[in-house]
Design a protein with these regions (language model features):
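Peripheral, solvent-exposed domain-edge segments
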Residues: 2-100, 107-145, 168-236
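Surface-exposed loop/turn positions
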Residues: 82, 157-158
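A glycine-anchored, Pro-Gly-centered beta-turn/N-cap motif
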Residues: 150, 155-157
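Histidine- and/or cysteine-centered catalytic micro-motif in compact active-site loops
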Residues: 151, 164-168
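A short tyrosine-centered beta-strand micro-motif
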Residues: 159-163
Length: 236
């Protein structure tokens, strides 16, 4: 009886970080440095650090998280070709295995007035570089930030920068409990050549279906290659 309890407790302790570590990408990064604080340039939402589950896949909340608002959010100036990204709050790091993404959507005018209902295109993704059933196989695992370089061909203007990380660690067998974490920063891009004609473009919601293999992949014993969810990284 004591032996069984000890084993159960040990398993629970080992799996606790994967199961309980929630986070939010609410700090803007520019050329490797943090700019502002939490929510200075990232839209605040009502979900705080909690994940969203599959019910959000068909909701407009998939754009920038539940209850996201531009009220009080500033817009940050960057140059095409700069490195930008998002940092986790409270010096947390990504403690779930899974893919990371960045999307852009150009506002028709002032990004503070834009709800993200226009076209989105994926500009960056990070999938497994090793086994998708091991945390060490995911480059985003253990990182404090996700960052990428803005294409130099972008059109000048104001954009929503959507960062997303998807935790697949709760998927077991036929049970799909993937976790979506997403936030939107407001940026103003200048200095681009303006020659970009992004393809493909997508609407959000519309980038996923609830049963996409890349969302439902069984981290605890899945077989075969991992298929990245969502559209391809856009050609610019």
């Amino acid at each position: 009886m004591v032996k069984a309890f000890t084993l159960t407790a040990a398993v629970a302790l080992l799996s606790a970080p994967l199961a309980s570590a929630h986070y939010i990408l609410n700090i803007l990064m520019h050329n490797g440095k943090q700019v502002g604080g939490e929510y200075t340039y990232v839209r605040k939402n009502s979900n705080t650090y909690m994940p969203s589950f599959m019910e959000i896949i068909d909701s407009k909340d998939l754009r920038c998280n539940k209850g996201a608002t531009s009220a009080g959010t500033k817009t940050y100036d960057v140059k095409a070709g700069d490195k930008v990204g998002l940092k986790l709050f409270n010096n947390e790091f990504i403690e779930h295995p899974g893919p990371g993404f960045f999307y852009l959507s150009k506002a028709p005018g002032n990004v503070s007035d834009y709800d993200g209902s226009g076209d989105w295109f994926k500009v960056w993704e990070s999938g497994p570089t090793g086994s998708p059933t091991s945390t060490s196989g995911w480059p985003t695992y253990g990182k404090y930030t996700m960052e990428f370089t803005l294409p130099t061909t972008l059109q000048d203007g104001e954009y929503l920068l959507r960062g997303e990380h998807i935790g697949i660690h709760e998927n077991r067998g036929s049970l799909s409990l993937y976790l979506n974490y997403m936030e939107c920063a407001q940026i103003r891009i200048s200095g681009g050549t303006g020659t970009a004609n992004p393809s493909p473009v997508s609407k959000i919601p519309g980038i996923y279906s609830k049963t996409d293999p890349g969302l439902t992949f069984n981290f605890w014993g899945g077989k075969g290659a991992y298929v990245m969810p969502g559209p391809a990284v856009a050609k610019l």
